[in-house]
Amino acid sequence: MTQAQNHIVPPGSKVLVTGANGYIASHIIKVLLDLGYLVQGTVRTPMPWLTEYFEKRYGSGRFELIVVSDFQQSDAFDESVKGVSGVIHVAQGLPSSTAAETVESATAYTVNGVVNLLKAASTKPTIKRVVLTSSIVAAGYPAGKGFKLDVDTWDKSLEQASKGGTTVPIYRACKVEGERQAWKWVEKNQPHFELNTVLPWLTLGKILHPNIGGSTMGYVSGLLKGDTTPFKFLPLPWFVDVEDTARLHAIALISPSVRSERLFAAATPFIWGDVIEILKRIQPNNARIPAAPVKEEPTIGDIVPAARAEKLLRETFGQRGWTPLEVSLEGGIARE
């Protein structure tokens, strides 16, 4: 680790992490606790099992939960930001039933929650950094080989849809506007804190607790039962390990060299054949693991800022580089 005295948010400070029961958020909490921070996590309903999980590993008084049931309320975060020195907003709100939503109403829902948090943070001079969990789709989901993403790249599907009458997936639209409007709000209102964002691609690795859904790792775990949904639902992407993603959030919170920056969490492209091969090595007697799709090619391109993120992981946490796919899956799948 870098010297603690250089951290923008010093160890021992309290950090707010929203959506504490989520896959990525739970790993962020673990990383922060490992670094010596106190953590307050938000959940929509009481979840004593989560408090028990972290107290068992870090002792009492290091982690606490606060219920924030509705991000849409203008005062939703007023209590949770009290006494904290940094905020990591992982749980960008999505409508509970996106099927009935228009793109406009869905993005308004997400943006409203983000802005409510930024407004609440702006009232607390103790808060030095706010980190927003965005997504690679905010920068533009590559359609094929030869793509290039950079720090100034934004997904253009919303603009194209408005001109040509095409539709945009609700999730993508919400992630794009959630991050874009956060930057616009900061530019307009000039709060005392700095904003950084983290844009992960397909995140894999260990699920910390059985009650945590596992998000994208849950799809991969389903392959062990013969569920081929990921082959159809998830286009061939790049992968990133969940702990690498969590560490990049911590870096965005504490590093004096990361200022008003977008950190891209994307390690390497892969094909489902790679995943199937690794799963069969981990569980060689599991006959339910399906065959990989016949025709696959990795999505080769250039994510320019990924090199910067990898360098930060090496400098801050002493890593050799991105965690390899095999190591990530071995950490997340039980051996037979």
UniProtKB/Swiss-Prot annotation:
InterPro entries: Epimerase_deHydtase (IPR001509), NAD(P)-bd_dom_sf (IPR036291), NAD(P)_dehydrat-like (IPR050425). One of its GO terms (molecular function) is oxidoreductase activity, acting on the CH-OH group of donors, NAD or NADP as acceptor. Pathway: Secondary metabolite biosynthesis; terpenoid biosynthesis. Its EC number is 1.1.1.-. Signal peptide: none annotated. NADP(+) binds at residue 171. One of its GO terms (biological process) is terpenoid biosynthetic process. Keywords: Oxidoreductase. Pfam families: Epimerase. Belongs to the NAD(P)-dependent epimerase/dehydratase family. Dihydroflavonol-4-reductase subfamily. Ketoreductase; part of the gene cluster that mediates the biosynthesis of andrastins, meroterpenoid compounds that exhibit inhibitory activity against ras farnesyltransferase, suggesting that they could be promising leads for antitumor agents. The first step of the pathway is the synthesis of 3,5-dimethylorsellinic acid (DMOA) by the polyketide synthase adrD via condensation of one acetyl-CoA starter unit with 3 malonyl-CoA units and 2 methylations. DMAO is then converted to farnesyl-DMAO by the prenyltransferase adrG. This is Ketoreductase adrE. It comes from Penicillium rubens (strain ATCC 28089 / DSM 1075 / NRRL 1951 / Wisconsin 54-1255) (Penicillium chrysogenum).
